[in-house]
């Protein structure tokens, strides 16, 4: 087994992306399991990937929230053969991703809504810090026995910052990109809210709100056709369906904020979520109720309470 800087013993590779690997590891100093993300060995040492993984560490380290996988450390190891490798040490979230659960079909609407409430709460914490995730999707949502963990702020960026990629290239997953992202507009929290709408739609139906066979066809359909309306789902509160529709609005100004979405979705399943103390006053187009308004006003250190139905447990 390899050890990074004499401290982090890499035990098992648990994920591989286009520019990085994630390993289950062991912190030999603090005597605990951790996750380590590092640039994939064998990739050429270009500044872009290195800068992005450093940015991920800095962005995620600013977030202290129960639905965000916390960052413990960042470094550059000289012990990897061939070249120095930057790495991030993160909380090891035990469970399965939402993508894995959705392979079996749609979730019960109560579970889907609760999952998305916790995702929205994580986004609200990020947005309160001026951070846009930019890659909200089922593969980046981990379902653990204790609740949801939003993973991989690897392409996160400060709200309003231009995309660092070359002209004509956009980072993100095509099905979850907001219309303005396709036009290379600066990242804003509203882009994350579009992705949340797709995530909610997919969790409720196990399909995307667009019909396409390939990624290129998907991008073409995205530009020519609006998202398909959410089908009728027995028992689903109408305000949840309306929220999903609002999140998928072409106009970013018509989408609800992450704070409003988190509170509305939590109310729909009688759950509670951690939300930022600072309450945005703009772009509150989603319907709210007295409970939601009261919760927002009183949310100083909200307690996360697990209500039935429980999240799917790790298999």
PLM-predicted stretches and their roles:
Residues 192:
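Conserved catalytic-loop aspartate of Hanks-type protein kinases
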Residues 119-131:
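Protein kinase catalytic-loop region centered on the HRD/HxD motif
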Residues 40-62:
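AlphaC helix of the eukaryotic protein kinase fold
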Residues 11-17, 22:
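Protein kinase glycine-rich loop
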Residues 74:
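Activation-segment/catalytic-loop signature of the eukaryotic protein kinase fold
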Residues 81-97, 101:
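Conserved short submotifs of the Hanks-type protein kinase catalytic core
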Residues 115-116:
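Activation segment signature within eukaryotic-like protein kinase domains
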